[in-house]
C-alpha cells in the first residue's frame, strides 16, 4: 500500500509531536503523516488504575509500550509507542547555557554549535509555552530570559524549603527546578496534585505528547499510522532526494507499506534515527552517521544535615543551582549542574539495628525516631563531557529483528580531553558536596558514580561543514535536500543538564525551514 503526503514524519515522540503541531499552524492544510513503530496508548482514563497497580504490586505502568525484538545493546530506550519516552518522563525542563554553544571558541574543547544563543533562547520560550512549563527566574544574571515562564513555579514542599535554606548557607544559590507540569489549568490539562508518580501522571498535569497527537487528530490536521515500522529510506536515481520510505504494517501481519512525500523528517530519537539512516545507506557521505554519540556523566551522594525533614512530600521535585554552568577560561575546565532532593537514605524503619540486634515493638519506633532526628538530602551533579568520533552507534549483525534487520549497538567513548580531566572534575564536585555539608554540620555519605552517560544524544550531529557533520542547524541533511533529522540526535554535545527542552527548541526552529522548503 502506498501513502502520499506533503510531509512524512518518521517517529512519534515528543519531537514529532511538537514538529507536527507547529507545521500545521505554519501552513494550514498541509498533508502531514506521522509513522510510529509502536502502538497508540490513548488511554489516559486508565492511568489512575495503572498507577494504583504499579504502587501496589510493582506492575509496569505502561504495558505494551515496546516491541519485543526491536532492541539493541547499550543505552537504548526500549520505549516504542505514540508519545515515545516522554509518555513517562519526569518533566524536567532545564535550559542549556550559552557556553554549550561555544565550547570550542571559549575553551578549545568539543565543538561549537551552528546556532546563535539569541536564536535558541527565542525557541526555548516557544518550547516552554507549548509544553507548559512552570518555573521561576534564576538568581544568576547570565540566565536572563526574554519571556517569563508560562506558569508560576511548582510550590516548594516543607522539605524543600528547609533544604533550600540549608543549601544556601554554603553560599550557593538555588531555585526550584523548572518542569513541564501545570501549576494551574493549562492547555486543557489539570493542575498538578503532587501525586509523586510523574512516570505515570494520573491527572494529565505533566506534559505528554499523546495529548498533542490526540488534539491534532481531533482537528484532522494529520494522519497517524501506528504499529508501522519504517525499515528503509529510498533515494532518488540521482541520490539528491529521498523519494520513499518503506516498511511493514505490524497490525496487518507485516504487510509492506510505502510512504511518498515532498519532505521526510526522521524524528526517531538518538538511537533509532541514525539506525534507520545506516540501514538505508543515506545521509552518510561524511561517514559520521552514528558517530559522536554523547550524553553527560554524573556523580551523586547523600548528605546528612542538621535539620529534620519528613520525606514523602512530592519527592520528585528538586532544587537546582546553575552556578557551575559557567567556567572561567583561566582555570581548569569543569561544568556541571547541582541538584538537591529530599532523601530518606539511612532513615528507613528497620527490624535490626547496626549491631544486628532484633528490634520489636516500641524499640522499632525508638530507633526510627533517633535516626530521623537529623535529615538527609540527595545531591547529584551532571557534568559536561565530550564525545570521541569513536563514540558510536553501529549495526549489530548478531542481533536482528523479525524482518532480518540488524539492531543497533551503542558504545560511548569520551574524547581525550574529557578523560584527562575526569579525576579533577570528580575532586571538584566532591568538594562542592563537602561545602554543602560543612556549612551545615553535616557529612557526605553514599557517593555514587554512573558507569554510563545519562540523557544520551547525538549520532547525526549538526554543523556547517558537510565533511564534519550530518545535517545543518535546521536538521536538513547535507546529502539529501528533502531529508531532515530532528530531536536529540542532532545535538553536537549534551551539556550538563537535562536535554529535552533543548532538542524540542531546536526542533521547533527547524519547522519554519521545513515549511519554506516545500514552497
Question: Language-model features: where?
Answer:
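Glycine-rich loop(s) and the adjacent beta-strand/alpha-helix scaffold that form part
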Residues: 25-33, 38-43, 48-49, 219, ...
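Short, hydrophobic/aromatic-rich segments at coil-to-beta transitions
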Residues: 240-246, 376-378
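Short, hydrophobic/aliphatic alpha-helical segments
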Residues: 63-77, 255-261, 319-323, 485
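Loop/helix patches that line or flank the sugar-binding groove of alpha-linked glycan CAZymes
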Residues: 392-404
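N-terminal glycine-rich phosphate/pyrophosphate-binding loop and immediately adjacent elements
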Residues: 1-125, 285-305, 311-316, 509
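Conserved redox-cofactor binding core of oxidoreductases
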Residues: 106-108, 112-230, 452
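Mid-to-C-terminal "cap/lid" subdomains and adjacent gly/pro-rich loops that border
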Residues: 39, 262-383, 519
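A glycine-rich dinucleotide-binding beta-alpha-beta segment and adjacent secondary-structure elements
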Residues: 177, 191-197, 231-234, 374-385, ...
Amino acid at each position: 500500500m502506498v501513502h502520499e503526503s506533503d510531509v512524512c514524519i518518521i517517529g512519534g515522540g515528543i519531537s514529532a509531536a511538537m514538529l507536527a503541531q507547529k507545521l500545521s499552524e505554519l501552513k494550514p492544510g498541509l498533508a502531514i503523516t506521522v509513522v510510529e513503530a509502536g502502538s497508540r496508548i490513548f488511554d489516559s482514563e486508565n492511568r489512575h488504575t495503572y498507577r494504583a497497580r504499579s504502587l501496589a504490586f510493582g506492575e509496569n505502568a505502561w504495558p505494551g509500550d515496546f516491541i519485543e525484538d526491536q532492541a539493541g545493546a547499550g543505552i537504548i530506550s526500549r520505549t516504542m509507542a505514540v508519545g515515545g519516552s516522554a509518555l513517562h518522563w519526569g518533566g524536567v525542563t532545564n535550559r542549556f547555557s550559552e557556553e554549550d554553544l561555544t565550547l570550542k571558541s571559549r575553551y578549545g574543547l568539543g565543538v561549537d554549535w551552528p546556532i546563535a544563543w539569541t536564536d535558541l533562547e527565542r525557541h526555548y520560550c516557544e518550547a516552554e509555552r507549548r509544553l507548559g512549563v512552570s518555573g521561576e527566574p534564576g538568581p544568576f544574571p547570565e540566565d536572563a530570559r526574554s519571556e517569563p515562564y508560562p506558569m508560576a513555579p511548582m510550590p516548594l514542599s516543607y522539605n524543600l524549603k528547609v533544604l533550600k535554606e540549608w543549601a544556601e548557607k554554603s553560599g550557593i544559590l538555588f531555585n526550584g527546578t523548572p518542569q513541564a507540569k501545570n501549576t494551574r489549568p493549562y492547555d486543557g490539562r489539570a493542575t498538578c496534585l503532587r501525586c509523586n508518580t510523574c512516570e505515570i501522571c494520573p491527572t494529565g498535569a505533566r506534559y505528554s505528547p499523546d495529548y498533542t497527537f490526540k488534539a491534532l487528530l481531533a482537528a484532522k490536521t494529520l494522519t497517524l499510522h501506528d504499529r508501522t515500522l519504517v525499515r528503509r529510506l529510498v533515494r532518488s536515481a540521482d541520490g539528491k532526494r529521498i523519494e520513499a520510505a518503506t516498511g511493514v504494517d505490524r497490525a496487518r501481519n507485516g504487510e509492506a507499506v510505502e510512504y511518498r512525500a515532498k519532505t521526510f523528517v526522521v524524528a526517531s530519537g538518538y538511537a533509532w534515527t541514525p539506525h534507520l539512516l545506516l540501514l538505508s545507506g543515506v545521509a552518510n557521505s561524511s561517514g559520521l552517521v552514528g558517530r559522536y554519540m554523547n550524553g553527560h556523566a554524573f556523580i551523586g551522594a547523600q548528605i546528612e544535615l542538621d535539620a529534620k525533614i519528613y520525606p514523602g512530600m512530592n519527592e520528585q521535585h528538586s532544587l537546582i543551582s546553575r552556578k557551575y554552568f559557567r567556567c572561567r577560561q583561566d582555570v581548569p575546565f569543569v561544568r556541571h549542574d547541582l541538584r538537591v532532593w529530599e532523601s530518606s537514605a539511612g532513615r528507613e524503619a528497620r527490624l535490626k539495628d547496626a549491631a544486628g540486634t532484633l528490634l520489636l515493638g516500641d524499640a522499632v519506633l525508638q530507633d526510627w525516631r533517633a535516626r530521623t532526628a537529623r535529615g538527609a538530602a540527595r545531591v547529584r551533579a551532571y557534568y559536561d563531557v565530550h564525545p570521541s568520533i569513536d563514540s558510536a552507534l553501529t549495526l549489530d549483525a548478531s542481533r536482528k529483528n523479525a524482518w532480518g534487520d540488524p539492531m543497533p549497538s551503542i558504545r560511548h567513548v569520551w574524547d581525550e580531553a574529557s578523560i584527562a580531566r575526569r579525576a579533577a572534575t570528580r575532586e571538584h564536585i566532591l568538594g562542592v558536596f563537602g561545602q554543602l555539608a560543612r556549612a551545615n554540620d553535616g557529612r557526605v555519605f553514599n557517593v555514587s558514580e554512573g558507569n554510563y552517560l545519562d540523557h544520551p544524544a547525538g549520532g547525526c550531529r549538526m554543523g556547517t561543514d558537510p565533511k564534519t557533520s550530518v545535517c545543518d542547524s535546521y536538521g536538513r541533511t547535507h546529502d539529501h535536500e528533502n531529508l531532515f533529522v530532528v530531536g536529540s540526535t542532532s545535538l553536537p554535545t549534551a551539556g550538563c543538564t537535562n536535554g529535552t527542552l533543548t532538542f524540542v527548541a531546536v526542533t521547533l526552529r527547524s519547522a519554519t525551514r521545513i515549511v519554506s522548503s516545500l514552497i
